Each structure stands twice: as structure tokens, then as C-alpha cells.
């Protein structure tokens, strides 16, 4: 496997070099060991509830208490090679489970780096770095465009430095200088994906199902990474305890079980003439006027108690801890849609027959360790001062996608079929929309395998809604350039740009019409798109030594979908509370970055970056490093998020925080 091969290669070279080193002294004498011991503690600076959290926090509550060691070890590997290792034990006592300590392929990986530097070819013209490492291609402030060789750990959004948040992977990194002065770089690397709170490789893959006899809730506490301060709404929609459809699906299955026998004695399959909205909008008097079968004891008992349709629905849904039905009465049902049954308003009760005792399951279809990503870059500096690079990679896209499907026995895929029926005002079937007495139509969903075997209560077979996490290959073609211009008033101004065209990446596409009839697998689909992203920046130095950098950033979705209720959703913020937030076709960001040393010997430094996001999201980070001496450094950082709550930054307003740290260098 790829990673084991790399480990073996690095270790073998180091071991082979030991006798050579031993000729001049002990192995340990030849090692260079340095490092840093650091503690960072953070508090919330705003009371509130972070996305998906079960309860609110108060201002000044602890967010983080992380102690870590970064140990750097360098040694010789033969006469012309060297090896390097970075080891980082870490513990955060305030983190949620899964984030407290070591985690492979994350920011807290115990073995951050392990590689060998050597040369090959005639006159050692090719420099090789083999092993676990980072390769940095992009230099934009606050975001990554060309910097896509390594994945990123977004456990603290963009607060951590690029060096800290970048996830090292195993790779072969080869560079050589060409005759015209250009530098050619080839990277063959292990494919790994970005890591987000709530969307990673630690999600429980056991099927989630409630009691199939009495509908008892057996899936409580199933939210992934609940309480993490940097959970985003888009992730909460997938794996969140309350709003995540991974956990909503089995609860819908249990509510459907409760419906059985309530509308007809024979079950739900024949109830094609009533939708969720029709039922929930009924007053108590309207319900009381309808005939109910003798088996409908739950409904008739509630009617006798004065309940309307929404209140009866809440009696069924209230037994579960997910966001099934937020309305409180027939008067406010779906006035503002923010719960599952409000979005599934056109689903018939016959559709719920297919959902009876449904389960859900999270699965992974990720690249194996024998798969590789490939990237090549050529960069050059011209005599006129222009520096540029041309970049290409064919890699698994770093952002994971989620594919939904219904599954049956032996993992067979089920096909949803929509059937339209027409009715008169009394709910009796009519032949079509043009016949006398026609009043309304409904669409009923059924599930069956390729052999025609139906699933549902009548069939006696329960389906499973699968959430499959995967990544897909994409082509990335990019360029970076910078050029210094001397001006009379501002001095030297560095103009720079990064440009990236991505082919065959994926976007989440939401279809609210499909969701309204309960066709969940067609409601959220991942579809191919092409994107063009770029950053234009300018850097100047003012007030003797203060660096000022301004950036304009745009992400253009070249296959954006905006067709009424069928649209490209914003992956970061799509949520039941905002109509699954439609994405911008051309998303823009603006940033300003300031950096200045201070002190008698300019030994301290402060930095400030502020980013403005289209539609009103804002983030500002102010940080200071204060050197008490050469070994001891104090750190201060304040991160403030604010603005529209349905933006990437604005949704994190309750996560605003202040951090204090102390770092000892040895």
C-alpha cells in the first residue's frame, strides 16, 4: 500500500545510513533535535448556540485548552541525503470527542512529517523529497486556490495558520532546474480529503434504525461531532443530531409505522388522496367530520381531545429527537418552512408506506492507499521581473461529496417511482385533470428493486437510506504570477494573481419539488460542474515596515443551476432553516491584511486580516506574537465572525473567540 511503502522507504534509507554515521560518531550525536512546547486556551466572546449544538454557551465559556509539542528531528541518511521528522503529540481537554488528541490525517496527526531529501540523475540534477510532507503552491491570504496538493483540516475554520491546518500526506516530490532557468516540479501523492467538523472518516457506519415493533426511538444521540464550535450548516444538514437527514430518516420510518392503520384499516398504501399538508392544515372540526376506521385510535383520540391536524402530527413526531415538525398548529404550518414534514408537504400518506421502519446508514467509498494524485508545475522568473507558474493536477477533489440511494436486502439498490393520481373534491379518484369534478392531483412514491420487488409495510420489507461519502477525480489547470511595480507615491507595489480552472468537480443540487413529495434521493444530488476561481492581490509597505495586502477573490460556477425550486445549493450553509440556501453563481470575497513588527528590536509582531463575504458574512482575526526572549513567546488572537447568518462566516457568529497562548522554543 502507498503509505506503508513510503514508511518502509524512509525507514530503510535511515537505517542503511546508520553505519555510515557511526563511523564518525554515535547515531544520536548526528541528530539535530529542536521543537516547541505550546499551550493555547480559548474562550467564547459571545453567548449563543453554535450550529447543531444541543445547548447554548455563555460568554467566556471555555472553547479550547490545547497543549502540544512539535518535535523536529533531522539527521543524515548516507553521504548526500538527509531525513526529517516532525512529531506532534497534542491534547485538547475542551474538545468534543474525536478532537481531543491524535487523529490520523488531521491537524493533530502524531506523525506530521517523515521524509528523506536526496538527489538523482546526472550531476544530481533532480532533487527528491520522499515521504510524508507538505507541498505549498498557492499563497493567497485566508483561502486556498492553487494550494491543493495537501488536504486541509478545517476544525477551526480558517483561524489556524496554513502550515498547521494543512494535512501532510505521503508523496514523491521531484524538482529540477531547466536550461532556461525554469523550475520543473512533479508530485505523486496519496489522495486524502479535507476534514470538516461533522464530515470526516469517523462517522458511525452502523445502520440506524428504531424499534421496528413499537417505533421506540433507538437513535437518540446519533449526531456526529455535536457541540463542535465550528460545525457548519451544510454539514449539520447531513449528520447533525437534530437537522441531519442521516438521523431524520429512521425517525420518519418510525412515524410512518405509527401512521399504519390510522387512515385505512388495510394500511397506508391506498391513501394516495391525502398529503401531509392537507392533513396538517385541517381544523379539529374538519377532522371530526371525516370518517375514520376503527383502527385509527390514535387519531380519533386526539380529535376528541380537540387537536387539529398539526397537533396530531406533533403527537406522532414528538416521540423523536430530530426536527420532524416545527409547526405548533394548523394556522402556522409551513408559514415558514424549517422542519422535515413542512418541506415534505406534498408527500402522500401512501408514500409513507414505503418508509415504514426505514433505516439509514453512512458508508464510505474513498480512494485506496494504492491510488495516487499527480501534479506538475513549471515556474520561471523573467528578466523584466515577472514571476509566474503554470500548474496542472489530476487528483481526487479534496471536498468530499455525499451520494444518496435507497438500498434493500443484500445491498441491492432500490428505484423510486413516482405515480400521479387525480381526485375530485371528495377525494375520489378521477380519470384526469380535464374531467368533470377534478379538484387536485398528488404524487405517490414507491420503492422497488430491479426485479420488481416492492419495499414498504405492505411488502413487509424495510428500505435503508444510504449516505455514501466519496470523492471524485478532477482536472485542475492553474497559474500564479507576481510583478513588482515602482511607484512615486506608494513605493514598490507587488501585483499578484492566482487562477484556477477546475473540470469535473461536483456541486450539491437541491430539488425542493422532489423533497416535497418525499423523493429524498432525488431531492439532493451531487452533479458535475466546472469552476473558475481567481485571486487578484496587491501588496505594499507603508509606515516604514507595515505590510498591507488587499485581495479580490471570485469563485465562478460555470454550470450553476437556478431553475425555480431546482438549484445549486451552497454547500457550506444549506439547511432547513434557510430553504437550503441557493448558492451564488459568482461568489466574491474581499480581504485586507496588515502585518507590522514592533518593539525596540522589532522582535514582536501583530497581524490583522479582515474578510468580507458576498451577502454579508464577515471575519476578522487580530493576532499578536510577543517575544519575551529567544525561547519564550506569548500569543494573543481574537477571531470575530458576524453578518448574515446564512453565509460562510456569519453562521459562526456564536463561535467568535479569544485565544491566549504561550510557546517555548527549544
Predicted regions span which residues?
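Residues that define the transmembrane beta-barrel architecture of outer-membrane proteins
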Residues: 61-67, 107-112, 166-170, 370-374, ...
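Outer-membrane beta-barrel "beta-signal"
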Residues: 151-154, 592, 653-666
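Outer-membrane beta-barrel strand-turn architecture
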Residues: 27, 75-79, 120-122, 166, ...
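Outer membrane beta-barrel
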Residues: 78-222, 639, 643
Amino acid at each position: 500500500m502507498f503509505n506503508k511503502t513510503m514508511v518502509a522507504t524512509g525507514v530503510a534509507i535511515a537505517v542503511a545510513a546508520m553505519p555510515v554515521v557511526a563511523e564518525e560518531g554515535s547515531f544520536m550525536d548526528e541528530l539535530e533535535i529542536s521543537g516547541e512546547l505550546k499551550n493555547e486556551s480559548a474562550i467564547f466572546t459571545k453567548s449563543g448556540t453554535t450550529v447543531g449544538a444541543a445547548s447554548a454557551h455563555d460568554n467566556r465559556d471555555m472553547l479550547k485548552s490545547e497543549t502540544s509539542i512539535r518535535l523536529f528531528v533531522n539527521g543524515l541518511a548516507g553521504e548526500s541525503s538527509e531525513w526529517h521528522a516532525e512529531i506532534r503529540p497534542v491534547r485538547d481537554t475542551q474538545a468534543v470527542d474525536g478532537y481531543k488528541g491524535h487523529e490520523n490525517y488531521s491537524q493533530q496527526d502524531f506523525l506530521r512529517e517523515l521524509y528523506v531529501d536526496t538527489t538523482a540523475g546526472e550531476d544530481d540534477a533532480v532533487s527528491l523529497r520522499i515521504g510524508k510532507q507538505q507541498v505549498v503552491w498557492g499563497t493567497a491570504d485566508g483561502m486556498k486556490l492553487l494550494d491543493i496538493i495537501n488536504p486541509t483540516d478545517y476544525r477551526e475554520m480558517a483561524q489556524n495558520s496554513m502550515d498547521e491546518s494543512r494535512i501532510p500526506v505521503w508523496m514523491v516530490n521531484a524538482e529540477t532546474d531547466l536550461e532556461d532557468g525554469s523550475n520543473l516540479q512533479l508530485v505523486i501523492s496519496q489522495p486524502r480529503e479535507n476534514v470538516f467538523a461533522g464530515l470526516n472518516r469517523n462517522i458511525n457506519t452502523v445502520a440506524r434504525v428504531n424499534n421496528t415493533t413499537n417505533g421506540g426511538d433507538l437513535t437518540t444521540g446519533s449526531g456526529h461531532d455535536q457541540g463542535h464550535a465550528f460545525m457548519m450548516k451544510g454539514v449539520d444538514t447531513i449528520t447533525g443530531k437534530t437537522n441531519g437527514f442521516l438521523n431524520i430518516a429512521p425517525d420518519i420510518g418510525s412515524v410512518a409505522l405509527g401512521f399504519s392503520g390510522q387512515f385505512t384499516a388495510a394500511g397506508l398504501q391506498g391513501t394516495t388522496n391525502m398529503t401531509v399538508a392537507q392533513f396538517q392544515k385541517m381544523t379539529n372540526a374538519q377532522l371530526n367530520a371525516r370518517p375514520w376506521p376503527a383502527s385509527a385510535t390514535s387519531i380519533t383520540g386526539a380529535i376528541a381531545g380537540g387537536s387539529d391536524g398539526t397537533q396530531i402530527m406533533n403527537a406522532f413526531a414528538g416521540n423523536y429527537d430530530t426536527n420532524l415538525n416545527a409547526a405548533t398548529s394548523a394556522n402556522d404550518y409551513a408559514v415558514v418552512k424549517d422542519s422535515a414534514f413542512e418541506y415534505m408537504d406534498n408527500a402522500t400518506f401512501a408514500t409513507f408506506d414505503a418508509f415504514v421502519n426505514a433505516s439509514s446508514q453512512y458508508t464510505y467509498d474513498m480512494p485506496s492507499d494504492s491510488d495516487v494524485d499527480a501534479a506538475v508545475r513549471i515556474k520561471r522568473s523573467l528578466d523584466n521581473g515577472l514571476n509566474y507558474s503554470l500548474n496542472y493536477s489530476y487528483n481526487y477533489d479534496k471536498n468530499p461529496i455525499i451520494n444518496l440511494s435507497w438500498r434493500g436486502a443484500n445491498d441491492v439498490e432500490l428505484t423510486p417511482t413516482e405515480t400521479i393520481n387525480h381526485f375530485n373534491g371528495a377525494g375520489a379518484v378521477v380519470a384526469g385533470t380535464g374531467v368533470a369534478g377534478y379538484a387536485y392531483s398528488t404524487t405517490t412514491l414507491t420503492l422497488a428493486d430491479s426485479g420488481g420487488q416492492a419495499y414498504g409495510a405492505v411488502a413487509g420489507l424495510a428500505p435503508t437510506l444510504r449516505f455514501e461519502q466519496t470523492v471524485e477525480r478532477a482536472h485542475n489547470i492553474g497559474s500564479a504570477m507576481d510583478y513588482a511595480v515602482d511607484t512615486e507615491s506608494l513605493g514598490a507595489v507587488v501585483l499578484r494573481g492566482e487562477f484556477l480552472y477546475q473540470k469535473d468537480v461536483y456541486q450539491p443540487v437541491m430539488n425542493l419539488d422532489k423533497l416535497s413529495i418525499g423523493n429524498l434521493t432525488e431531492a439532493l444530488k451531487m452533479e458535475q460542474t466546472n469552476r473558475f476561481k481567481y485571486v487578484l492581490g496587491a501588496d505594499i509597505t507603508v509606515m516604514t515596515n507595515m505590510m498591507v495586502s488587499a485581495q479580490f477573490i471570485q469563485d465562478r460556477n460555470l454550470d450553476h443551476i437556478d431553475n425555480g425550486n431546482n438549484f445549486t445549493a451552497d454547500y457550506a450553509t444549506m439547511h432547513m432553516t434557510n430553504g437550503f440556501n441557493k448558492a451564488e453563481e459568482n461568489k466574491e470575497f474581499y480581504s485586507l491584511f496588515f502585518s507590522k513588527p514592533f518593539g525596540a528590536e522589532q522582535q514582536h509582531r501583530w497581524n490583522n486580516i479582515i474578510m468580507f463575504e458576498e451577502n454579508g458574512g464577515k471575519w476578522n482575526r487580530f493576532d499578536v506574537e510577543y517575544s519575551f526572549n529567544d525561547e519564550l513567546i506569548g500569543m494573543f488572537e481574537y477571531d470575530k465572525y458576524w453578518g448574515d447568518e446564512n453565509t460562510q462566516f456569519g453562521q459562526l457568529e456564536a463561535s467568535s473567540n479569544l485565544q491566549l497562548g504561550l510557546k517555548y522554543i527549544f
